[in-house]
């Protein structure tokens, strides 16, 4: 490939007031990252890649088909950080040496930036759902029950795209680990969003939801808590178990899925929507974990601890019945047809967002598992007339991951670079002059393999 003229640093396009607040938040020292690929045992620091945020237009929300766009990834990283600042995060080893970070993360300055932008950022990140989901038409408890049964049967009948991609991968172990990382988003802080819907007074449905919550927390026994048994599964794969160790590898779809339940739980005007969403989620979890057990046993045999999956394959059948009968249908019966559209919308949105999780994870697995082919595709890609973006790296450069809205060709202009696309798989070494096509929406990071490394990012115009 011919090296095109070098571009100046990307102009700031973050947009108006929202963009300025986002850049101020992401530019805080807590969120600038370090040179390590895996984050340390500090829940307050996570890489928000402030340099790439400046390229995103936060005046242009992603449409229904743009959930994997870079600005969607950036928005959901921010939202996830905002939401977690409303929970209690303490490192397992204690706060010694981290008191200052604790104070900064929960302190007034970042809190004011969050509170001044969270509603606008939610509209930016989730506004596309209004366009993508239509719940017009008859809205009765009977319609609600029939629609719910239909989508649950649909989910149970079809194989998981992500688990299918794992089973078909050349490097199935790395693919399986990538999937575990996406589950860790919720698995290590499980039921945190649900906890925001437990206060108040709303009758037997409140008690039914609390039954599920206390199950997730092991009825007060820490060793039985679902986050504890999820960590056992990670340890059996020799993976880190602290919160957000693999922050750099969370994909836009899984981030959006996790954030969606916080989004609904933060605004109690959306309570009935939450009730629909959580009922759908609980109903489809059990068959999904049955499929996961089959795939993971086929790869790892008895070397992987699947207690977490066994537990969910069993308990979520029970939770599915509770939420369907004692939450979803009970709320519709008690409060009448007027709440049914919101219950329906919650089911439909949860189904859609869950599809983002599956499709994004499957696409990342397929791409990262077939990088030699994307070396070949780089050679035939037609890049645009715009000068490429130049990225210079040294051993001290902070490591972060990002994606692009459209396809780009990554070319090594100086030195050598390691392309990192999975949390545990080997990186793809690119020598001077070599190139690789990165499809739009695919997550990657670059590590220098020589004292000084420079890469060029050539945009590929849509066909």
Feature names for model-found ranges:
Residues 2-394, 399-413, 418-462:
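Non-heme di-metal
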